[in-house]
Amino acid sequence: GLVSSIGKALGGLLADVVKTKEQPA
């Protein structure tokens, strides 16, 4: 559903932010 898609998108964004913090480019 829509909520599930939004949750997945937010989860992906959070994962990217955490990755960037742990391993600065």
UniProtKB/Swiss-Prot annotation:
One of its GO terms (cellular component) is extracellular region. One of its GO terms (biological process) is defense response to bacterium. Expressed by the skin parotoid and/or rostral glands. It comes from the Eukaryota. The keyword Secreted applies. It is found in: Secreted. The keyword Secreted applies. Keywords: Amphibian defense peptide, Antibiotic, Antimicrobial, Secreted. Belongs to the frog skin active peptide (FSAP) family. Caerin subfamily. Antibacterial peptide, that adopts an alpha helical conformation which can disrupt bacterial membranes. Each caerin displays a different antimicrobial specificity. This is Caerin-2.4. It comes from Ranoidea caerulea (Green tree frog).
